[in-house]
Curated annotation (Swiss-Prot):
Source organism of the structure: Desulforapulum autotrophicum (strain ATCC 43914 / DSM 3382 / VKM B-1955 / HRM2)
GO cellular component: cytoplasm
Binding-site residues for Mg(2+), renumbered to this chain: 74, 76, 78
Oligomer and partners: Homodimer.
UniProt protein name: Phosphoribosyl-AMP cyclohydrolase
Amino acid sequence: MVELDFNKTGGLIPAIAQDHETGEVLMLAYMNEAAWNKTLESGMATYFSRSRQSLWKKGETSGHVQVVKEIRIDCDNDTVLLKVEQKGGAACHLGYKSCFFRRVVKGDDPVIMEQQIFDPKKVYK
């Protein structure tokens, strides 16, 4: 079994979620050891919420869960890449497919590059 280095990074490691078919980066979150183990056990992406200080099963409220299709780890065993099937079409809590829906050109204000899939005000009441 792979041993991830949670100690090097203060107990949390970066976890990148990528669409398993297109390769599009959907989001960056963090995992502690409990989130890592839950992800391995369930096959569903589970992260550690830094704001709530608790485990967070992606999509638990919105229904936009991430089914893990493949897991890769980096050369230092301190970053995880999850190749996922994004259910419901949106990974971002603001209702977009990707959390990286804004583009910056030459330091100007960000430009929204995607259409919103859902209204977060209706989903997160």
